């Protein structure tokens, strides 16, 4: 499967303890996937390796056919692979538009381009009508879409 996200033989070792041993994943765009297992089974560690929080001890990770195993998290994000934490990550005292503009500050765009991109994202996420609302006043679902 060359379509989306693939991990082959992921391994992670902390000292003598191997916490992830030979995990393979193959995910297509739009799929909803869950990792199940007891505490300490390596679910979070596997996820962190895929998104780039930590480097695997072994194995490879591919996104759309391109190997990304050694890429830092921010470069993976530019390729479309991101992480949405369980905890709220929107700035509560900023508007929906201001939240997106703050994130776009890190992109090599002009002020005008950032504004256009932010407005396009608000449209894409179906929350353009909420652009001037403070993040704390959004519903849970609206806030999650903003955080995406």
What are these regions (language model features)?
Residues 134-138, 142:
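Conserved ABC ATPase signature
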Residues 59-67, 79, 117:
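Conserved ABC transporter NBD signature motif
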Residues 66, 112-130:
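Conserved ABC ATPase "signature" region
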Residues 51:
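Helix-to-loop junction immediately C-terminal to a conserved catalytic motif
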Residues 36-38:
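The feature captures the beta-strand-to-loop junction immediately N-terminal to the Walker
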Residues 93-102, 131-134:
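Short coil-to-helix segment of the ABC ATPase nucleotide-binding domain corresponding to the Q-loop/switch region
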Residues 15, 71, 98-113, 124:
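ABC-type ATPase nucleotide-binding domains, specifically the catalytic core motifs of the NBD
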């Amino acid at each position: 499967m060359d379509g989306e996200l693939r991990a082959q033989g992921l391994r992670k070792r902390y000292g003598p303890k191997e916490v992830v041993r030979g995990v393979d994943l193959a995910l297509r765009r739009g799929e909803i996937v869950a990792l199940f297992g007891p505490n300490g089974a390596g679910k979070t560690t596997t996820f962190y390796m895929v998104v780039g929080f930590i480097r695997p001890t072994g194995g490879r990770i591919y996104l759309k056919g391109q190997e990304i195993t050694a890429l830092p998290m921010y470069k993976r994000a530019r390729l479309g692979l991101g992480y949405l934490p369980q905890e709220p990550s929107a700035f509560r005292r900023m508007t929906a538009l201001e939240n997106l503009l703050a994130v776009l500050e890190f992109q090599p765009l002009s002020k005008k381009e950032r504004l256009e991109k932010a407005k396009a994202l608000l449209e894409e996420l179906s929350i353009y009508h909420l652009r001037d609302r403070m993040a704390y006043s959004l519903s849970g679902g609206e806030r999650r879409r903003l955080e995406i």
